[in-house]
Design a protein with these regions (language model features):
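N-terminal cap/lid segment of alpha/beta-hydrolase-fold proteins
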Residues: 34-84
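Alpha/beta-hydrolase active-site loop
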Residues: 138-163
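Alpha/beta-hydrolase-fold enzymes
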Residues: 186-290
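Short beta-strand/loop motif that positions the catalytic acidic residue
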Residues: 333, 339-341
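Conserved alpha/beta-hydrolase "acid-adjacent" motif
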Residues: 346-352
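Catalytic histidine-centered segment of alpha/beta-hydrolase-like enzymes
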Residues: 370-380
Length: 398
């Protein structure tokens, strides 16, 4: 650790101490809030660790914990307030992410630098958000995610309006990163808005066009939570006992989840690559005789409940379908949508990007450098974003 790093570290500790002692930084607005300061400290250190171009951006962060209907605990909210801003961007995190990531803050600073305030939310697939039962049972289900995001935003504006008067009068725009970008695109196509906020623009950064990525992450979480053992070659692999344990966990998760599905949600499963996770669950549970009840549940309750009913063989055949983009397939994007995408993003194939580019035309900017979201650090990105957002009439940037 070099001297400059040490100096920055000690400065951050000093600032954290000062900020944590200031009630205006993290004022709990929910009764019986047990942990007002640890998250404030964490958010401050994270913000300082990001090499912001403008110190004013770092110091503008205000962190709240907001009570949202249906949530078991307060929702963390990051608010970068830009004095005099007439428009606020709601920025949605990527799959399982929160606004404390450097990429999130790089994008937030770009918005802030151009004269916008930024309201940051954790991903609907992150535990901080998924305390609402439906998100917890089915992460990645866009209709439920968007409904809960809309309700959360309405509650956030209502609860913070007294402390942040600008949020009661501001205009609004919606932006998202990765999975949050997919939610942004879906919201731009919604016939009925999910929030009372009326978004004037939608900006998506690297939207993954295939939900199978998110669903595979869900499956992997079961495996990572299982005990592993060392092989003679020194690698860690799941033991048979851990596989059985993972199978039992899957059995409990999927049986409880599927039992709560409506007909509309079951049709959603058929339309998306989510079905592959179900097939993997069937495969894993078949290793343990105690899990046969889950297979029985699928065959006797789930599959016959579909209209028309499906056999297990017919269900398995569905994995060969090649249409993972159903919700975004038929309706052209409105002119208020802007997409930035990295050509070497691992979450979307060249075919996907070409398909999206064809539908968006000049509304889409492609970048080759930097890897997944690495382009957010480039001068070209800053310039393109500034030019693209100029119709929203922000204040001049610093």
């Amino acid at each position: 650790m070099g001297p400059r790093t040490l100096i920055r570290f000690f400065k951050s500790l000093t600032l954290v101490t000062l900020v944590a002692s200031c009630a205006s930084f993290d004022t709990p607005i929910v009764e019986n809030d047990e942990h007002p300061f640890p998250e404030a400290m964490f958010a401050t250190v994270s913000s300082l660790a990001y090499q912001a171009r403008s110190p004013a951006f770092t110091s503008s962060l205000v962190h709240y914990r907001v009570g949202v209907k249906g949530f078991r605990r307060p929702l963390p909210v990051w608010y970068w307030k830009r004095p005099g801003a007439k428009l606020t961007f709601v920025l949605l995190s990527g799959y399982g992410g929160t606004p404390d990531s450097s990429v999130f803050q790089a994008i937030a600073e770009n918005f802030w630098d151009q004269g916008f305030s930024v309201l940051g939310l954790p991903s609907s697939t992150h535990p901080d958000f998924s305390q609402a039962a439906s998100s917890k049972r089915l992460p990645g289900h866009l209709p439920r995610d968007l409904k809960e995001l809309g309700e959360a935003l309405d509650d956030v504006r209502e609860r913070l309006g007294g402390r942040e008067p600008d949020l009661a009068t501001t205009r609004w725009a919606l932006a998202g990163i990765s999975y949050g970008a997919l939610q942004t695109l879906q919201e731009s196509l919604a016939a009925t808005p999910h929030s009372s906020l009326r978004f004037e623009a939608y900006v998506a950064f690297n939207p993954p066009l295939r939900l199978s990525y998110a669903m595979s992450r869900l499956d992997e979480s079961f495996e990572r939570g299982a005990p592993q053992h060392l092989t003679p070659t020194g690698s860690l692999v799941p033991s048979m006992a851990s596989k059985i344990h993972a199978a039992q966990t899957r059995q409990l998760y999927w049986s409880e989840t599927l039992a709560a599905f409506s007909q509309e949600e079951l049709e959603f499963l058929l339309a998306w690559d989510f079905r592959k996770s179900l097939l993997r669950a069937i495969s894993w549970t078949s290793q343990d005789p105690r899990s046969l009840s889950f297979g029985n549940y699928l065959q006797t309750q789930l599959l016959p409940s579909l209209n028309p009913p499906l056999t297990l063989d017919q269900w398995s055949a569905l994995q060969d379908l090649k249409d993972p983009r159903n919700p975004l397939e038929s309706t052209p994007y409105p002119p208020s949508v802007l997409v930035f995408h990295s050509l070497n993003d691992p979450l979307s194939t060249a075919e996907d990007i070409g398909w999206l580019k064809q539908r968006l035309g000049s509304q889409m900017q492609l970048y080759r450098q930097g890897g997944h979201l690495g382009y957010v650090w480039s001068e070209r990105f800053r310039s393109d974003l500034r030019a693209s957002l100029s119709p929203l009439n922000p204040m001049p940037g610093n």
